[in-house]
Regions:
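C-terminal nucleotide
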Residues: 1-116, 126-158
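A short, basic/aromatic helix-end/turn motif that makes direct DNA contacts
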Residues: 119
């Protein structure tokens, strides 16, 4: 992937909670290679064609250095994840801490959007910040007010 000339400023947040990754993956894998109910068909479609399109759109946003679009795509991806995955394993995918971070008003002012990382749940979140100063402010807020560990990551730039 060609990296943008202007960096994208991301913040990775460790939610500091436990999750059962094997259970989460097992619940999603039941929809493959074929599925026999509406919930499974939603997961199958979401992890197939829908996800391919979203990833292609995200690659375009990264190449263009378009943080606002990337943030919106991440937010939309999380909403789709919630719609499709949560019914498969509510105990793991409801993720109240993740959703509290993603819905935090202070972070919303500093970030274009975000989503969970990996197979979801209460592991980590990634946020696309509006700029470097916003990322630094978001990191300070996450550490001092939310009491969570976080790490800034720049993608691209020279």
């Amino acid at each position: 992937i060609a990296l943008p000339k202007m960096p994208l400023h991301l913040l990775v947040v460790d939610l500091g909670k436990d999750k059962d990754t094997p259970l989460m993956l097992k619940s999603l894998q039941r929809s493959f290679p074929c599925c026999d109910d509406d919930c499974g068909r939603r997961v199958h479609s979401w992890l197939g064609e829908e996800n391919q399109q979203r990833v292609a759109d995200a690659v375009k946003a990264v190449r263009a250095g378009d943080a606002e679009t990337l943030g919106a795509l991440m937010t939309a991806a999380q909403k789709d994840f919630d719609r499709c995955a949560t019914p498969e394993c509510p105990s793991q995918f409801k993720a109240p801490t993740l959703h509290a971070v993603l819905g935090d008003e202070t972070l919303a002012e500093l970030c274009w959007g975000g989503k969970g990382i990996g197979c979801g749940g209460e592991g980590s979140a990634q946020l696309v910040c509006r700029d470097e100063a916003a990322r630094d402010s978001a990191a300070r807020y996450v550490r001092e007010e939310l009491g969570m560990w976080c790490c800034g990551v720049d993608v691209g730039g020279s």
